[in-house]
């Protein structure tokens, strides 16, 4: 079902009775489309819930991908919908972190080639790159697909955001110089990146929290 444009609608249609079952029995159960998370006080109870889900899906002509089924205890971290939950700490998942760093790296190479091929100046090159990622990270007001409205309200640490910030700065310096080394900090200072519309995720996160904490 995942990957289909109407997958969320289909999941809601087929799983609404299962949602009602868990809700009526006061079981800690969360679902987004066909991603399901269930909490329990002990392993026996959890296995019982898992079997209930399996039975319901089989009776409905559906199935579970065994490669995406995990049982974990509260001391372990779990990744769910792009988040990593580790005790009371909620951060961006390692998989999501790897994906966004990959996109940044590919974009940096692309903009470096574009800059050289078209003989584009440093500032407009970085402005264009930042426009792309600022739209992804911050979007427009109430853009639910942007990181600002998807991740910011739920994470409670800036560890991953800080890592992305540093990686983004490194890649943008590479776009200008064509190399990765410590001298880039002098050749392309932070103020220059800001002049090119670069926005720090950590800074934007704290601004978002200050504006939205009641």
Show where each model-derived region lies.
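Non-catalytic terminal/accessory segments
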Residues: 1-33, 37-214
């Amino acid at each position: 079902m995942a990957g289909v444009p109407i997958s969320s609608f289909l999941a809601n249609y087929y799983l609404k009775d299962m949602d009602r079952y868990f809700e009526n029995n006061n079981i800690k159960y969360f679902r987004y489309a066909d991603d399901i998370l269930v909490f329990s006080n002990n392993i026996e109870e959890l296995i019982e819930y898992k079997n209930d889900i399996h039975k319901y899906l089989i009776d409905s002509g559906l199935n579970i991908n065994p490669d995406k089924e995990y049982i974990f205890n509260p001391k372990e971290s779990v990744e769910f919908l792009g988040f990593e939950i580790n005790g009371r700490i909620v951060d961006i998942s390692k998989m999501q972190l790897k994906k966004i760093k990959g996109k940044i790296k590919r974009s940096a190479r692309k903009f470096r080639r574009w800059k050289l091929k078209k003989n584009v100046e440093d500032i407009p090159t970085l402005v264009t790159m930042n426009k792309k990622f600022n739209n992804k990270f911050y979007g427009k007001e109430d853009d639910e697909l942007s990181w600002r409205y998807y991740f910011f309200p739920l994470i409670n640490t800036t560890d991953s955001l800080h890592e992305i910030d540093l990686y983004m700065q490194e890649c943008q310096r590479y776009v200008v110089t064509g190399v990765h080394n410590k001298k880039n900090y002098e050749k392309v200072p932070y103020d220059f990146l800001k002049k090119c519309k670069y926005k720090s995720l950590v800074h934007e996160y704290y601004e978002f929290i200050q504006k939205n904490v009641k």
